[in-house]
Amino acid sequence: RRQRQMCIRDSFLGVQSVYPNVAMEVMYTNSWFDIDKEGAAAEALIANGSVIIGQHADSTGAPAATQKQKDAGKICYSVGYNIDMLETAPTAALTSATNVWEVYYEYLFKSMMDGENPATNWSEGYNEGAVAITDLGPEVAEGTAEKVAEVEAALKDGSLHVFDTSKFTVNGETVTTAPIDLTFYDYSTGTPVAVYQGDTEEAITDGYFSESTLRSAPYFSLRIDGITEDADPVA
């Protein structure tokens, strides 16, 4: 769940930058790919009043369910993951977050051809073109493309930090310190087992939480205010 938790929080902060009073409800499927559970989660969230259904799982279950609910008269939209969801949700899809894998593969192959060992801890972003969003859907608000371009430019030049600590609170308080244990744990057995012993380092510098700079694996796990996580996974 750790990677998903980080993506939940940055999605929330992105929406909150436009709609300050937004609230987010989170349901877990405990799977990277389960069409039925993802669809059921989307339907349950929409029934609870959610208007935008985001996902950090790989199937088309959530976008398809969102489109079905929208066709039935609900006001609801989808933000997908990894691939363009417009074929699945032609009017409900707003966009998808996606990884641009050719950037990494080009780096990997070039390193090998040059006789160099590729980095084992690699994480890049907008500046290198390693992440992006897919085409915008037909029902995005007027001016969205221009705003997206503005935000992407700010991410690239470093003037915008997603995890600016002035933009969120934890239990009503501004966070000023966040020591991160960089030990790598294997959670596959249900009991965490340390497979690499790392140092503990401070993640907050210059007023923002510096995600994915101390290591490539996500480590932003602060439970920020405004997000409710359902305790039980989707059945």
Residue ranges, per PLM feature:
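Periplasmic-binding protein-like
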Residues: 48-59, 77-81
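Extracytoplasmic/secreted envelope proteins and their assembly/folding machinery
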Residues: 12, 38-42, 59, 63, ...
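Short, small-residue-biased leader/transition segments that mark boundaries at the very start
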Residues: 3-8
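Extracellular/periplasmic periplasmic-binding protein-like sensory domains
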Residues: 71-145
